[in-house]
């Protein structure tokens, strides 16, 4: 080494030492500055997979794809032993339908629907003439099917090679006589945890992993061994279960083997997909409806609520109304997968929200069940086509009794792996406040003998007050922090708030009332004004003719008069940029993949392995 080279090396060491000294006093982040080399590379969108899991449909595709693949989110698993009892998750049926009060509630809901239909005039200024189901029943009872073909053209899935599992369309078309259990791993937007077979968290995650892996291989043509070169964007509900999200992230990174992940909320992604910056998002899915207000890429926590009904409830309600009108296909069963598919199709074909369509109309439909003849039925329907979708605004018509129908954003239960969750922060914050108050009390207390008794009384009372506070911090829904002598009042306030929440969540809010409630929870009048001016409807549950005008009319009529005077126009958007509303959230996930700011949101496999759920707190674009 030459003298010059030695000098350069020494200078380098000195500079390095100085740099180290400068950094000694700096607070270091949880995640080290040294990150995987992949961070330095420019992310290519065709190596990013966007996953939007729904209750009935999985939407999955590369960020560069124009449209995602839409796959039924269902799996059929072969029985381990001969003679095992068959198990299948229900689709259109649900708990709370067969209670003694169900039919009475259904009838009361239908009366409210009929009253609303009659009270709103048609566009020519006249009132609709109601059509009773008896007018259609006598005609429909006489109808017999015509045989179009002795073979429907559809076949049951071939299971002669005894596959361990079948996914998507193949699972839907498994013959009920074959030895397969049917599982829908997501119900009403959450993981389908239940006490039956395949209902544990581990089993549900295993089903999801198989379905997603199959879709990636079949529709995206990506071998699973190559997932280490890919990253994933996962869309989650606005009101999410932290434990479930953590398990899904762990599955994607550690089991499926993706190199990185970004987790974001459906509502925010819907704004990205529609190109709107501030809007009230109304996501009407197949099994749940969620409403929240999004402003500049942030979902306002207080405005979030989830309603436990959706498109499949409308399908079931439509079937009940058609039965009253003498539905000619008398063999229809809600427990049959093929009949559920048929009812969904009939709802999408015939139902509408157009007040101007009145009177009896003739319709026809075909039944093409596997290994059966193709049949053609003719029948008549009147107001049933309008009554069924209106049940979204009068959910008593669904006849669901004794179920929690509305969910608000609650405080998390806490996670032992996350040392800085809300429970920890609240507990430490409260102890600091108590400690500070106790110190202040001691300082302010004077030394004369006459005051010693009072001081002793105060200090002896302090542990009780501390104890009462710590006990109260346990529940997840509490919003009150107790301090000092206010503990009893705070406890009373907390209990009354909990009671109010439980009463509110027991009610089935109509869609229009849910939107008004969400907007009313915004913090300022300016924000409320923005939200009333822009209501975006996404999801496939409200894709009815004239739905946009109908919802707009309901919101205008029910919004507070103070806002009606200052808002020029209530804009309800059902098809932004002429896009399919079912794909908008997925499209927003694809847009998110291409944003420069997303570079800071990636959680990498090695980081997750080392830091676990803390990475979600560090990197999530929303408050974890």
Swiss-Prot record:
GO molecular function: ATP binding
N-acetylmethionine: residues carrying this PTM: 1
Annotated compartments: Nucleus; Chromosome
Main location (coarse class): nucleus
Assigned keywords, A-Z: Acetylation, ATP-binding, Cell cycle, Cell division, Chromosome, DNA damage, DNA recombination, DNA repair, Mitosis, Nucleotide-binding, Nucleus, Phosphoprotein, Transcription, Transcription regulation
GO terms for biological process, alphabetical: cell division; DNA recombination; double-strand break repair; regulation of DNA-templated transcription
Record flagged with keyword Methyltransferase: no
Residues involved in ATP binding: 55-56, 283-286
Keyword Nucleus: yes
A Pfam family annotated for this UniProt entry: Actin
Sites of Phosphoserine modification: 132, 412
Function of the protein: Plays an important role in the functional organization of mitotic chromosomes. Exhibits low basal ATPase activity, and unable to polymerize. Proposed core component of the chromatin remodeling INO80 complex which is involved in transcriptional regulation, DNA replication and probably DNA repair. Required for the recruitment of INO80 (and probably the INO80 complex) to sites of DNA damage Strongly prefer nucleosomes and H3-H4 tetramers over H2A-H2B dimers, suggesting it may act as a nucleosome recognition module within the complex.
PANTHER family: ACTIN
Protein name: Actin-related protein 8
Species for this entry: Bos taurus (Bovine)
Higher taxonomy: Eukaryota, Metazoa, Chordata, Craniata, Vertebrata
């Amino acid at each position: 080494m030459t003298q010059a080279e030695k000098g350069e090396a020494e200078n380098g060491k000195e500079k390095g030492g100085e740099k180290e000294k400068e950094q000694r006093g700096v607070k270091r982040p949880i995640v080290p500055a040294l990150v995987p080399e992949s961070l330095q590379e420019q992310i290519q969108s065709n190596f990013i997979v966007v996953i939007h899991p729904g209750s009935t449909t999985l939407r999955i595709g590369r960020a560069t794809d124009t449209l995602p693949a839409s796959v039924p989110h269902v799996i059929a698993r072969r029985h381990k032993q001969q003679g095992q009892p068959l198990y299948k998750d229900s689709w259109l049926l649900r708990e709370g339908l067969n209670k003694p009060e169900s039919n009475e509630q259904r009838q009361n809901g239908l009366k409210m629907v009929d009253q609303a239909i009659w009270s709103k005039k048609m566009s020519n200024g006249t009132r609709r003439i109601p059509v009773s189901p008896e007018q259609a029943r006598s005609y429909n009872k006489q109808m017999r099917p015509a045989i179009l073909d002795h073979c429907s053209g559809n076949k049951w899935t071939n299971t002669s090679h005894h596959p361990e599992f079948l996914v998507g369309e193949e699972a839907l078309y498994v013959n009920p006589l074959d030895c397969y259990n049917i599982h829908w791993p997501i119900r009403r937007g959450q993981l389908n945890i239940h006490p039956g077979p395949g209902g544990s968290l581990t089993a549900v995650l295993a089903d999801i992993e198989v379905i997603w892996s199959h879709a990636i291989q079949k529709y995206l043509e990506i071998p699973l061994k190559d997932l280490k070169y890919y990253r994933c964007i996962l869309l989650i509900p606005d009101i999410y279960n932290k434990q479930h999200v953590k398990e899904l992230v762990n599955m994607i990174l550690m089991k499926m083997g993706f190199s990185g992940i970004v987790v974001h909320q459906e509502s925010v992604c819907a704004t990205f997909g529609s190109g709107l910056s501030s809007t009230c998002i109304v996501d009407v899915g197949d099994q749940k409806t969620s409403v929240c207000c999004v402003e500049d890429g942030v979902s306002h926590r207080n405005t979030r609520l989830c309603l436990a009904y959706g498109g499949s409830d409308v399908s079931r309600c439509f079937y009940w109304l058609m039965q009253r009108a003498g539905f000619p296909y008398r063999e229809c069963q809600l427990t049959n997968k093929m009949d559920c598919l048929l009812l969904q199709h009939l709802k999408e074909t015939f139902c509408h929200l157009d007040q101007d369509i009145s009177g009896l109309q003739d319709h026809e439909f075909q039944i093409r069940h596997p290994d059966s003849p193709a049949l053609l039925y003719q029948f008549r329907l009147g107001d049933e086509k309008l009554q069924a979708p209106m049940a979204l605004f009068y959910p008593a018509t669904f006849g669901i009794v004794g179920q929690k129908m509305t969910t608000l954003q609650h405080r998390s239960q806490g996670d032992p792996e996350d040392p800085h969750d809300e429970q920890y922060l609240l507990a430490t914050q409260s102890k600091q406040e108590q400690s500070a108050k106790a110190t202040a009390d001691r300082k302010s207390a004077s030394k004369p003998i006459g005051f010693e008794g009072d001081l002793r009384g105060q200090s002896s009372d302090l542990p009780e007050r501390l104890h009462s506070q710590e006990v109260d911090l346990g529940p997840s829904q509490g919003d009150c922090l107790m301090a000092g002598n206010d503990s009893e009042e705070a406890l009373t306030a907390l209990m009354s708030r909990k009671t109010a929440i439980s009463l509110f969540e027991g009610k089935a809010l109509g869609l229009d009332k849910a939107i008004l409630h969400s907007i009313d929870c915004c913090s300022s009048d300016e924000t409320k004004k923005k939200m009333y001016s822009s209501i975006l409807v996404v999801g496939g549950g409200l894709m009815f003719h004239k739905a946009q005008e109908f919802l707009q009319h309901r919101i205008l009529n029910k919004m507070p008069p103070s806002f009606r005077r200052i808002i020029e126009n209530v804009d309800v958007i059902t098809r932004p940029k002429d896009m399919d509303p079912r794909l908008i959230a997925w499209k927003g996930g694809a847009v998110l993949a291409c944003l420069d700011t997303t570079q800071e949101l990636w959680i990498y496999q090695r980081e997750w392995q080392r830091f676990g759920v803390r990475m979600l707190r560090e990197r999530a674009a929303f408050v974890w």
